Amino acid sequence: MNSPLPDVALTEVSSALIALDWVGMQGVEVPLTLGEQGATHPVHAYADLQVDLTDPSVKGIHMSRLYRLLDGFAEHQVLTPETLSALLEAMVESHVDCHSSGARITLTFNLLCRRPALVTEGLSGWKSYPVKLEAVWRAGRLCLDVSADITYSSTCPCSAALSRQLLEEAFVARFGRQSFVDPMQVAAWLRENASYATPHSQRSVATVQVRVAEQATEMGLMALIDTVEQALGTPVQTAVKRADEQAFARLNGQNLMYVEDAARKIQQALEGRYPASSVSVRHFESLHPHDAAAQTSSYLS
């Protein structure tokens, strides 16, 4: 005899009649296909998905329903704002018996893409960008925020000035008493001594979050990453030869920046492009055992 399986989420009432903002699952592994320019490979994502539980008398939600919706989405859909909105709406509809009215999803993954070398033709390598998508659906409207971590090099302007001063002093000590200086002699001296003092630089990370416009047809992940890298001027490289390393050294010299400069450069590049944006930058100082950090945000009226 096959007896019905008990479902206490339906048959029992919670002992504490309290509404819950969100209930669901965290860290669900899922492969996703991105509907993005330049995204040629599926990503291994982690999903947090929840619905609200505003009726205090409902003991619990049906997590298996959420899991199956996500699994079907991953198998049959390409991830865009439109399809994500439809998934969230389906999550709410799957819990009509729980009186849920809102749903949210957080997706995290690494976006892997090829980046060309600065100078060497035909040379490129893979670069990974940690990405987070946060989507909330309520009353038929989608609110979607995307964020990405962009790694770059930062060279300290103060350290560069101090290094130049030391080089200047060394140059004067060597050539200061000469009424005429042979350019070739100077060039030879510079080859040996131009690194008499060098400014400190370090790998740095910018975490940039933007609100995706309601009418957007894609998340615009690569467009966001490209905008930030172009604003900074010194994104870390992948495959390099000596000519590329030299070009990178030039870029660092042309784009000296404090952590404040980096945050302002990025925010300026984002202005007017998104309904809202926030920037958090961190320089992993080579001079200190601690990091330098700055944050800024902007909202269109």
UniProtKB/Swiss-Prot annotation:
GO terms for molecular function: GTP cyclohydrolase I activity. Pfam families: GCHY-1. Pathway: Cofactor biosynthesis; 7,8-dihydroneopterin triphosphate biosynthesis; 7,8-dihydroneopterin triphosphate from GTP: step 1/1. It is an enzyme of class 3 (hydrolase). It catalyses: GTP + H2O = 7,8-dihydroneopterin 3'-triphosphate + formate + H(+). Its EC number is 3.5.4.16. Keywords: Hydrolase. It comes from the Bacteria. The keyword Hydrolase applies. InterPro entries: GTP_cyclohydrolase_FolE2, GTP_cyclohydrolase_FolE2/MptA. GO terms for biological process: tetrahydrofolate biosynthetic process. The record marks 156 as: May be catalytically important. Belongs to the GTP cyclohydrolase IV family. PANTHER family: GTP CYCLOHYDROLASE MPTA. Converts GTP to 7,8-dihydroneopterin triphosphate. This is GTP cyclohydrolase FolE2. It comes from Pseudomonas syringae pv. tomato (strain ATCC BAA-871 / DC3000). The gene is folE2.
